[in-house]
Amino acid sequence: MEEHIMIADVILKNKQFYILDERGKEISRKWEDELGELIGFSDVFLVFKRRDIFYSYDENFKENAHKWVSELGECKNVVGSIANFRKGEHIFTRDRFFGEISNRWV
C-alpha cells in the first residue's frame, strides 16, 4: 500500500509553488508558469487553473486529472478528497479525479 504524505501548506516563492508537509518540510516544487493559478488545496490534493482548464495534482505534482472550466463550472472549495464546483444552478461534488460524486440545486 502506498503511503500518503499529507499536504499541510502550499506556498509561492520565487515563481515556484512549494508543497510542505506538517513539519514544514518541502515535499515537492514546480514552476508557477507550468501550473497556473492555485484555486485550492487540501491534505490530499491541489486544484490549479491554467488556460481555462482545471488540473488536479497529488502531493508530488503528479496530475490526477484535468477538465475544461466550461465542463466543471466555478470551483467553490477543496476539502479532504473532494472539490465542490458550481455550474449554473447546481453544485457538483467531485472527487480528486473530477468524477461526480453528487449534485444538488443551489
Specify the residue positions occupied by each region the protein language model found:
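Beta-strand-rich domains and repeat architectures in extracellular enzymes and scaffolds
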Residues: 2-9, 26-37
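Short beta-strand elements that form the blades of beta-propeller/WD-repeat-like
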Residues: 2-12, 18, 42-50, 54-55, ...
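Surface-exposed loop/turn elements that mediate protein-protein interactions on large endomembrane-trafficking
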Residues: 16-32, 55-69, 92-106
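Residue-level detector of conserved, function-critical positions
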Residues: 30-41, 45-47, 67-84, 105-106
